[in-house]
């Protein structure tokens, strides 16, 4: 179990309350697929993701980005039990989808970049970033737990 300070809980909750999952999710997944093109192999069912323009205009990419952020909302709501919250999702990504667990970290970085770009230094302060990065690290660890 992770020990969260009251300040960390408040920072995560406050930041999450400002995030539009319909904006940040698609941006983050788009960024992942463009900046780290080897991740595209996990999204073959999404149709054309072979060019930046195709990725930017792909509705399946946008929808899955929203889905990813919905998953993060579950973690925000279950800060004290993120490991169990993500157990089935971790198992699915490991056993069915065969996603390299390092990609979770890479996507988390893309999410942070998008959040920082959206909110800037007035909202995404160093203290908020510290709590947010800790949160994402716990999520990434939980997603990687079912890997052998």
Swiss-Prot record:
Subunit structure: Heterotetramer of two alpha chains and two beta chains.
Free-text tissue specificity from the UniProt record: Red blood cells.
UniProt binding sites for heme b: 64, 93
The family this protein is said to belong to: Belongs to the globin family.
SUPFAM superfamilies reported for this sequence: Globin-like
Biological processes, Gene Ontology terms: hydrogen peroxide catabolic process
One MF annotation (Gene Ontology) recorded for this entry: metal ion binding
Keywords on record: Heme, Iron, Metal-binding, Oxygen transport, Transport
UniProt name for this protein: Hemoglobin subunit beta-A
Gene: hbb1
RNA-binding is among the record's keywords: no
Domain Globin: 3-148
Keyword Transport: yes
Cross-referenced InterPro entries: Globin (IPR000971), Globin-like_sf (IPR009050), Globin/Proto (IPR012292), Hemoglobin_b (IPR002337), Hemoglobin_oxygen_transport (IPR050056)
């Amino acid at each position: 179990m992770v020990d969260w300070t009251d300040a960390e809980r408040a920072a995560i909750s406050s930041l999450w309350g400002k995030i539009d999952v319909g904006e940040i999710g698609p941006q983050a997944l788009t960024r992942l697929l463009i900046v780290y093109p080897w991740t595209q192999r996990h999204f073959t069912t999404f149709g054309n993701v072979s060019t930046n323009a195709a990725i930017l205009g792909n509705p399946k990419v946008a929808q899955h980005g929203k889905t990813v952020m919905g998953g993060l909302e579950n973690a925000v709501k279950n800060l004290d039990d993120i490991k169990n919250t993500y157990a089935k999702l971790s198992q699915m990504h490991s056993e069915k989808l065969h996603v390299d667990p390092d990609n979770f970290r890479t996507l988390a970085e893309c999410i942070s970049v998008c959040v920082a770009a959206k909110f800037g230094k007035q909202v995404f302060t160093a203290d908020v970033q510290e709590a947010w990065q800790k949160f994402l690290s716990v999520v990434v660890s939980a997603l990687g737990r079912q890997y052998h």
